[in-house]
């Protein structure tokens, strides 16, 4: 009975350990997806394309699994919070950028929920992206 209990306990511990490593791997790959979308956005430098790249980065990261979706949310929220602070420092309490930030967050959520990021793709954006 002790052997059976020990085997069950060990399998539970190893199972949780395995899930944790899987989550971390997904988060790491999801963070790379977010970085790739950001790099592509900077490279494209295409007018009105930021929502597309927000949605695409979140979509790609979330496709990795729960760890990727978590990383996408953390990175997206951090980016928007930093942008809010810099907007406040530049423009004071004018509300500048609030609507854009809300639209960015909507695009982020769109992508994370598995919806097609091409919904936000602007006409004329090169096929490379």
Curated annotation (Swiss-Prot):
Keyword tags: Pyrrolidone carboxylic acid, Secreted, Signal
Predominant localisation class: secreted
Q: Which residues carry this modification: Pyrrolidone carboxylic acid?
A: 19
Q: Does the keyword Hydrolase apply?
A: no
A Pfam family it matches: SAA
Q: Where is this region: Disordered?
A: 90-129
Localization in the cell: Secreted
Annotated Gene Ontology cellular component terms: extracellular region
UniProt signal peptide: 1-18
Question: Biased composition, Basic and acidic residues: where in the chain?
Answer: 90-103
Q: Which domain of life is it from?
A: Eukaryota
What the record says about family reads:
Belongs to the SAA family.
How is the quaternary structure described? Answer: Apolipoprotein of the HDL complex.
Functional description taken from the UniProt entry: Major acute phase reactant.
Task: Please identify the protein, giving its name as recorded.
Answer: Serum amyloid A-2 protein
Organism annotation: Sus scrofa
User: What are the top taxonomic ranks of the organism?
Assistant: Eukaryota, Metazoa, Chordata, Craniata, Vertebrata
Report which gene this protein is encoded by.
SAA2
